[in-house]
Amino acid sequence: MYQPAIDLAGEVCFHPNFFQTKVRINYSIDQYLGDQKLGDRLEDLPQQFLNPQPRKWSNIHWQDIHPEQVIGLELDIFLSIIKGALDTEAPIRDYTQTSRQYLEPIHPSMARLVGGMVADDGTIIELGLWEKEERQHTPALTKLYQMLATESIIPQVQTAKSYQAWTNPYQDLYQHGLHRVITEYGAACLYLWLMSHTTGTTQQVLSELLQDEVNHLAKFWGMGMWLYPDGAEQLICYLLSQIHTILPVSYESTIKSPANIKSTFQRMMSILNWQSWSVLCRGELIYTFIWILKRMWYWSSQLTPEYLHSCCATPDFFGNNSVECNQPKVIIF
């Protein structure tokens, strides 16, 4: 009796069509972005504020990685995507310190979780949990690339935007937070889609990356909803508009934003060598973008203000923000 091979993305298809890949994508979304999983990651915040502990990866047998584990996707395209991902992941120190600076005036505990603690002279005296987890990604992607390509690679580190304070810390954090959420969302979508085109140890590496990104996405998304309760619907609409910018149909956005979110999304896709992908692969990733966004919207619609408060509030937040300090009404369109 025929027994289909099963991996982390469901039934394995070595020559998949769009509909078979779609089934694997849907299966992975249910496994890694279920309501319970997202809720657990958000509810983990209070404990992580008190005693931050990095998520442990499973044991990976790197010697078991081989090119045949990439399925339904040309190896050179897969490798170009991995190279783009590791180049994007590489400047993690810059990412964490910039986010810490935006968070410190508003939520010191979240700032510490993200970027650790820094002395007056700029010396880092404690690494943030986010950096501890994310700094594993570039070495893992580099090793994955080298095992599949049988050649070494040196990351071409991208330039991260530096901290720029304007007039209102809440508005500054909101604009920066959009970049952060879009980046985490994009990474989660990419790694989940790549899981649908891999199996074996190669897929296991991608699943560890995905779990980290989903963890961070849930925390940043939930924190953003708590700090900016009027911004959730605008975020969904904005993410949809960014997906629109990479559709084959010519599109010129009329949206103006000082954060320049459009360039964030398009630059990310350019680094991933998007222009060389087949129409099928583009369609699969766009499908992944939309379905994960749908899942995040459904999950976030269930989060009450009381629940968000229980996950995100800390005494130092209220010490930093008097009741007289009115948050600006967030407008990004």
Regions found by a protein language model. Name each.
Residues M1-F333:
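Non-heme di-metal
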